[in-house]
Amino acid sequence: MASEQPEAGSLADRITKPEEPAPAEAPEQTEDIPQTDGAAAQQGGSDLHEPDYTVEVKLSDLQADPNNPLFSVKNFEDLGLDPRILQGLSAMNFRKPSKIQERALPLLLGNPAKNLVGQSQSGTGKTAAFVLNILSRLDLSSEQLQKTPQALILAPTRELARQIVGVIQVMGQFLDGLVIGTAVPADTGARPAKMECSVVVGTPGTVMDMIKRRIMIANKLRVLVLDEADNMLDQQGLGDQCIRVKALLPRDIQVVLFSATFPAHVHEYASKFAPQANEITLQHEELTVEGIKQLYLDCSNDEDKYQTLVNLYGLLTVGSSIIFVKTRASAQEIEKRMVAEGHTVASLTGGIEGSQRDAVIDQFRAGHAKVLITTNVLARGIDVSTVSMVINYDIPEIHQPGARQRQADFQTYLHRIGRTGRFGRVGVSISFVSNREEWEMLNQIQRYFNTNIQRIDTKDWDEVEEIIKKTIKSSRAQLGFR
């Protein structure tokens, strides 16, 4: 990788050289933590702290001025929200809108409702923004309406769907009659006779099946949200399912797409899925998560990768760690070998049953399992506050059969490393490189995000340990841990 030192104050400098830790004896006060987002704090979610970035707004009404004060808000009280929703925000430690919420909420809450395509970094409040919009549009004035689906949120995985349900439960805890339903694959295939709830959160295939079987009535839906929209619209199968679900919904439904990344081709697709939408975007150079020390290790071959991981085990358990691999088979093999050698690890892939997946992620959130081996099923949206390290055991890549050169998957890399260093904390991401092709893919990532990824010499494990421990200690000190 590039050997030049980044200029002081540059993006690369901020990422590869996190600030010195705050004194452990001076933990942050609640007032200094305006929000939690991703998972609610009650679920072990992370506090929201924002880096310096600019939110760009493009209005569907080209004659309107996006800088008009009407399209920005500084206080939740200025939005005319139900006092019970404000009470829920207060219970979640929401003191003022995040930067993305300042611009998104006036656009989301306007009447008549307009579509929105929103791009924002992980941990900047996008989950709370679309949940707030949904809660403000619900009519819970009768028992019948409370049991009638009025809002639908689609997520790519059951883990993210369950996390979103938790946010709705906490934010909407003071709304009488709020009923939330989850539409994710059932282990036994058993389904309820009818979805009697006001908000449905689920995965596209299950939702489509429920609507077709009339388990879920869709004709009263007012809002459709796609979280991690780029993943669902770009992924074969999920994109088709999303389109089919939308075709079954009322034509005047408000469509909201939120994600941390929108590649150009997906953005074009999203514009068709949510026509005449207001847009909120960031430049991709601004998307690399600030506060994550990005490192890479040279490994001679696949076996050396595994031995390197074993050597890192003691550091992996300082906080919590996620190890990302390419395939389910790799996850199972690594787990099997590490457990046989006496290490405590867990794995989570799309190949295991839903209830078992739920149990694994719940144990990880609670800290009972500190090292989690997974595929890209957990790369997006999942917020666990204790994660201090992410390992890219395999560099994320776009599979292009017949291609002469392997292509790094920039968006997946961003989402993966975003599982640590969330909301102002300092985290570590380590990528394993075992051949020239993997090194070139990491180089592609560095160029795309205009950042620096630092090489660590695995011949000197004392140095490796010192660098990583110092960064993790910095993260814990910022949280006031002792």
From Swiss-Prot:
Chain segments carrying region Disordered: 1-49
GO molecular function terms listed in the Swiss-Prot or TrEMBL record: ATP binding; ATP hydrolysis activity; inositol hexakisphosphate binding; RNA binding; RNA helicase activity
Residue spans crossing the bilayer: none
Disulfide bridge positions per record: none
Domain Helicase ATP-binding: residue ranges: 107-280
Top-tier EC class: hydrolase
Major subcellular location class: cytoplasm
Coiled-coil boundaries: none
Keyword vocabulary terms for this entry: ATP-binding, Cytoplasm, Helicase, Hydrolase, Membrane, mRNA transport, Nuclear pore complex, Nucleotide-binding, Nucleus, Protein transport, RNA-binding, Translocation, Transport
Gene Ontology biological process terms from the UniProt entry: poly(A)+ mRNA export from nucleus; protein transport; translational termination; tRNA export from nucleus
Record EC number: 3.6.4.13
Alphabetized SUPFAM superfamilies for the sequence: P-loop containing nucleoside triphosphate hydrolases
Its membrane topology: Peripheral membrane protein
Residue positions of motif DEAD box: 227-230
One cellular component term from this protein's GO annotations in UniProt: cytoplasmic stress granule
Residues spanned by motif Q motif: 74-102
Subcellular location(s) of the protein: Cytoplasm; Nucleus, Nuclear pore complex; Nucleus membrane
Domain of life: Eukaryota
InterPro entries: DEAD/DEAH_box_helicase_dom, Helicase_ATP-bd, Helicase_C-like, P-loop_NTPase, RNA-helicase_DEAD-box_CS, RNA_helicase_DEAD_Q_motif
Segments forming domain Helicase C-terminal: 291-464
Pfam families documented for this protein: DEAD, Helicase_C
Residues given in the record as ATP binding sites: S120, Q121, S122, G123, T124, G125, K126, T127
Function per UniProt: ATP-dependent RNA helicase associated with the nuclear pore complex and essential for mRNA export from the nucleus. May participate in a terminal step of mRNA export through the removal of proteins that accompany mRNA through the nucleopore complex. May also be involved in early transcription.
Note on domains (UniProt): The Q motif is unique to and characteristic of the DEAD box family of RNA helicases and controls ATP binding and hydrolysis.
Family: Belongs to the DEAD box helicase family. DDX19/DBP5 subfamily.
Protein name: ATP-dependent RNA helicase dbp5
Organism of origin: Aspergillus niger (strain ATCC MYA-4892 / CBS 513.88 / FGSC A1513)
